[in-house]
Amino acid sequence: MKATKGRNVVVVGTQWGDEGKGKLVDWLTESAQGVVRFQGGHNAGHTLVINGVKTALHLIPSGIMRPGVKCYIGNGVVLSAAKLFEEIEGLEKAGVQVRDRLRVSEACPLILPFHSALDVAREAAREQGGTEKIGTTGRGIGPAYEDKIARRALRVQDLKYPERFATKLRELLALHNHILVNVLGSKNFTFGDALKPYIKDGEVQFDAVYEEAMRHAELLKPMMADVSRELNAAHAEGANLLFEGAQGTLLDVDHGTYPYVTSSNCVAGNAAAGSGVGPGMLHYILGITKAYCTRVGGGPFPTELDWEKEGTPGWHMSTVGAEKGVTTGRSRRCGWFDAALLKRSAQVNGLSGLCITKLDVLDGLQELLLCVGYELDGEKIDLLPMGADEIARCKPIYESIPGWTDSTVGVTDYDKLPANARRYLERIEEVTGVPIAMVSTSPDRDHTILMQNPYAAQ
């Protein structure tokens, strides 16, 4: 008898990242047999809290915390082998089995030390030239994607062939060292401790990069795989898969607040291209959104509040929400919920349902403001514009909703939420036109309200 094909869910961030995707992916993996990362690199940070223990992941899919769940890093991810093994070793010290459950696509482009050097040097050059920084993490993500698009990247599969790897590495170093020294003036830069072992007189050294890559090659070989083939086979055999997005829709290189974006497509459609499955295998798109908005780094943010002034709503969000980046440690900018922004995210992702996270952070605020549109150059609009310049000119149009004083922390029954909290959530549904499937009421895995299970929804 032929097996029933599995049901697959895509989880994407709908704002500027940091929406709490890691917790929800971990929660959903109770119904999944495989979890897939399909874009980004170790610039993304996911925090999981299980039985009070906090775990931060950057590359490895969040499903690794569920025993028996297979984890896949798809071809759309740019891979730092050094950071991957750093993460693996940290998990193994905590008693988590990783290597026998992790598969890495041979088509992943590699992030190498010269990519990080380029990233750091470019941001420094922008700052010295008086240009606003993009706000990258400095981890080489953008330069690695540039090499991929230019068809010159070293990929995971190249690690299997040392001579070929060495030839391509010399070619890349000739190009990138020229840019570092002669265009960006790297001889005048002081690189951080992580890069110093690879750099001499502003240039990245071949031997240091090659020797480390060959050490990683031996460790990585048992995990190398044709991820596309494995995912399609698992689906055909009835496995449920979960595709885990990184960053958020408004950081998407095409649909975000360009140029203040990441270097990959963060939207749901890239789950197919970034892992090697057909779009027909993506059955439910779950959009994760905070009950307010945050953003790290530069770029327009229409509903931003003064989050540094004590006693203000923005300060409340920042402090109660512990709004610091998992990857960078930078403080996140905070602001009111933007439903017009979410409508844009719903449009480009084709959202099936929403998960609202950090509802508990809003406990105690007397009044909440909900952005339902903007005034742009004298005209009222109800959808986030495409261009960063236009977004910067948008003045939010707010609706006022009363806050609540009762705690929502740990609530798992929708009907037990304060009446005004339910009113707030219902208004978000009305304005965006997307049903709420789940609500998170603390970082803990079990503090989740379920209205519609994405794996059961039809």
Swiss-Prot record:
EC code(s) of this entry: 6.3.4.4
Sites where the protein binds substrate: V326, T327, T328, G329, R330, S331, R332
Domain of life: Bacteria
Alphabetic keyword roster: Cytoplasm, GTP-binding, Ligase, Magnesium, Metal-binding, Nucleotide-binding, Purine biosynthesis
Catalytic class of the enzyme: ligase
InterPro entries: Adenylosuccin_syn_GTP-bd, Adenylosuccin_syn_Lys_AS, Adenylosuccinate_synth_dom1, Adenylosuccinate_synth_dom2, Adenylosuccinate_synth_dom3, Adenylosuccinate_synthetase, P-loop_NTPase
Residues annotated as binding GTP: 17-23, 45-47, 332, 358-360, 440-442
Binding site for Mg(2+): D18, G45
Role according to the record: Plays an important role in the de novo pathway of purine nucleotide biosynthesis. Catalyzes the first committed step in the biosynthesis of AMP from IMP.
PANTHER family noted in UniProt: ADENYLOSUCCINATE SYNTHETASE
HAMAP family per record: Adenylosucc_synth
The protein's name in its UniProt record: Adenylosuccinate synthetase
The gene coding this protein: purA
